[in-house]
């Protein structure tokens, strides 16, 4: 049989090891080195570090690498406090000193604002809370592994559908973290674990809340065990057989207190993850907005009334507008519960022109907006038409804040205050607040 020559396969670029110097961090917290003048992004590295990296992706304008060996650590490097760090997709900056994280996030905010809006301003002091045990809500992923016949119970890995099994989480508040091992043990013995979707955990002011999302029927005896667990921990238990269905099995309806106001909510409603930072954020928003007894204030993306209720105690009137009708109804109920009669709430698509809406026919003295990560591009150009002299923009994405600020500046507003809100310590995620004035 003839034998043909076959050259050895060349080593693919993706598998080569390279020694590089990390020069800075990108806006997602990844280290940036340069390889042949091309930026190389390496998760888990810090500026000033010499590392060995394995290329995992190589494009024409950038490359990505995996940290193989740390040759020279940065002074800001610390030992991660969670054994699941690097696997769990939650925290991505536990290897960095906390004060260094704050400085990095503030630099990121300033850089983005300057890049997109051209604005340069001194930052206000950052709003911070607890470094650990700060999360009052979390979603635990569940998946039944048919091969191993084990229930996967934990958090999604970074950029993956795989589950990192956990029974502890140091950034969860203690009353939620202590539930993890017991919930895993109970759910692992359900008769139909393939019907389990996820568990939503929330720490309300009147106790923990456990919500089980399931996609098929559950046996009464299984639900009884879960109910017993909830009652032992003085927690409220909900079942969620569909995304729009909630059934309270035991316990009280949850609520939280916000600077003197009681805010009831359901476990599938959005509330801020970090209670201490949220409280300070509301106080700062009130200080910057400075509502007077003669002011008509507009609260866009008002949710349950996190800002509307406190503003109403100081302003002549508050108009809250939200894109989710269920939240609008709950905000109105929350105002009534707190005996607030100068607030009204409306449902509207805040991605479209709203100036013609009846609630927008009145002029407003001041505006607060707190959009989702996508920002407020659909409505930001309409702000000046409402007549407000002062606008407070609360943002969970500095890139969209910077983008939207361009429009506000073009409408004649000036950026007079800017500050970072550290809602998620030990992650690269940052929130911010900006004040615009005419």
Curated annotation (Swiss-Prot):
Domain TRAM: 11-69
Enzyme class label: transferase
HAMAP family membership: 23SrRNA_methyltr_RlmD (MF_01010)
Name the record gives this protein: 23S rRNA (uracil(1939)-C(5))-methyltransferase RlmD
Binding of [4Fe-4S] cluster, residues: 82, 88, 91, 169
Record GO biological process: rRNA base methylation
Annotated active site: 396 (nucleophile)
Entry function: Catalyzes the formation of 5-methyl-uridine at position 1939 (m5U1939) in 23S rRNA.
Residues annotated to bind S-adenosyl-L-methionine: 272, 301, 306, 322, 349, 370
GO molecular function terms attached to this record: 4 iron, 4 sulfur cluster binding; iron ion binding; RNA binding; rRNA (uridine-C5-)-methyltransferase activity
Keyword annotations from UniProtKB, A to Z: 4Fe-4S, Iron, Iron-sulfur, Metal-binding, Methyltransferase, rRNA processing, S-adenosyl-L-methionine, Transferase
Entry EC no(s): 2.1.1.190
Domain of life: Bacteria
Reactions performed catalytically: uridine(1939) in 23S rRNA + S-adenosyl-L-methionine = 5-methyluridine(1939) in 23S rRNA + S-adenosyl-L-homocysteine + H(+)
Organism: Vibrio vulnificus (strain YJ016)
Gene name of the encoded protein: rlmD
The family this protein is said to belong to: Belongs to the class I-like SAM-binding methyltransferase superfamily. RNA M5U methyltransferase family. RlmD subfamily.
Family annotation (PROSITE patterns): SAM_MT_RNA_M5U, TRAM, TRMA_1, TRMA_2
């Amino acid at each position: 049989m003839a034998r043909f020559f076959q050259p050895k396969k060349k080593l693919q670029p993706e598998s080569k090891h390279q020694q590089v110097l990390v020069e800075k961090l990108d806006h997602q917290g990844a280290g940036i080195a340069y390889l042949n003048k091309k930026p190389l992004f390496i998760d888990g590295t810090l500026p000033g570090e010499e590392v060995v990296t394995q290329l995992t992706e190589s494009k024409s304008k950038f490359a990505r690498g995996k940290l193989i060996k740390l040759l020279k650590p940065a002074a800001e490097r610390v030992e991660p406090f969670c054994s699941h760090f690097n696997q769990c997709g939650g925290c991505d900056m536990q290897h960095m000193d906390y004060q260094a994280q704050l400085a990095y996030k503030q630099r990121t905010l300033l850089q983005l604002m300057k890049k997109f809006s051209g604005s340069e301003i001194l930052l206000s002091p950052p709003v911070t809370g607890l470094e650990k045990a700060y999360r009052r809500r979390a979603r635990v992923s569940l998946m039944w592994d048919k091969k191993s016949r084990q229930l996967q119970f934990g958090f999604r890995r970074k950029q993956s559908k795989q589950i990192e099994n956990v029974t502890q989480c140091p950034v969860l508040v203690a009353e939620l973290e202590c539930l993890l091992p017991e919930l895993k043990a109970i759910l692992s013995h359900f008769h139909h674990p393939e019907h389990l979707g996820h568990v939503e955990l929330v720490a309300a002011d009147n106790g923990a809340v456990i919500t089980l999302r399931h996609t098929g029927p559950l046996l009464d005896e299984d639900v009884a065990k879960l109910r017993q667990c909830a009652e032992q921990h003085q927690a409220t238990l909900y079942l969620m057989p569909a995304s729009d269905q909630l059934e309270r099995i035991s316990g009280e309806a949850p609520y939280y207190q916000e600077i003197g106001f009681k805010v009831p909510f359901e476990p599938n409603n959005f509330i801020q993850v970090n209670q201490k930072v949220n409280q300070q954020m509301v106080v700062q928003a009130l200080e910057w907005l400075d509502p007077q007894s003669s002011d008509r204030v507009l609260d866009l993306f008002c949710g349950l009334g996190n800002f509307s209720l406190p503003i109403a105690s100081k302003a002549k009137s508050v108009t809250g507008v939200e894109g989710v009708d269920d939240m609008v109804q709950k905000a109105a109920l929350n105002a009534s519960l707190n005996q607030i009669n100068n607030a009204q709430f409306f449902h509207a698509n805040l991605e479209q022109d709203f100036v013609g809406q009846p609630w927008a026919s009145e002029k407003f003295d001041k505006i607060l907006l707190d959009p989702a990560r996508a920002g407020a591009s659909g409505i930001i150009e309409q702000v000046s038409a409402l007549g407000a002299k002062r606008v407070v923009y609360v943002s969970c994405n500095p890139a969209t804040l910077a983008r939207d600020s361009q429009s506000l500046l073009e409408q004649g507003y000036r950026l007079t205050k800017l500050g970072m809100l550290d809602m998620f310590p030990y992650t690269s995620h940052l929130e911010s607040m900006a004040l615009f004035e005419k």
